[in-house]
Amino acid sequence: MRRSGGAGIAVLMAGAVLLAYSPVTGAAEHKFVGTAKCAMCHKTAAQGEQFPKWQASKHSKAFEALASPKALEIAKAKGIADPQKAPECIKCHVTAAGADTSMVGAKYSVKDGVGCESCHGAGADYSKKSTMEGITGGTIPAASVGLTLPDKTTCEKCHNKESPTFAGFDFEKAKATIAHEMPAERKAKYKTGG
């Protein structure tokens, strides 16, 4: 009896689509280190104080927001007992949601909400100072170590119609509210390497 490969191909394609649209960036190749690791370097004025800017943002409070009265009301209406434990909620409120525990480092915490690695990729392979210097100097391609520069598509993995509170998404406006740029003199040296 001869089998058709159509069913197998369909399963593979479905898996590829799910991975492509997963909010977990870089989970298959790189480990997550957590925002505390990022903060070690990205809190200084010389670096642009990215960490304090993130701490003041809604992203840093995304997990916490799932315990708010509004979130609990929405969850109840959808038959969800605890939004802080529901995969359909945490997938966009927690960095590395759904990632295997072997893919997260000791400093990782779900309480960090939508942390650095949700947008910039899992950081274990680019979090060392020497690696970052290689990236900024152009000798290490950022993508080769998991560092990504987020774009509209990155944001729309969560800011979309699947969210029960979605009211449209203006990428440029949203980008301005979370801007955490490097100082111009450092940015001039920065090369993504592809």
Each language-model region and where it sits:
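Sequence context of c-type cytochrome heme-c attachment sites
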Residues: L19-D112, E117, G123-L149, F169-G194
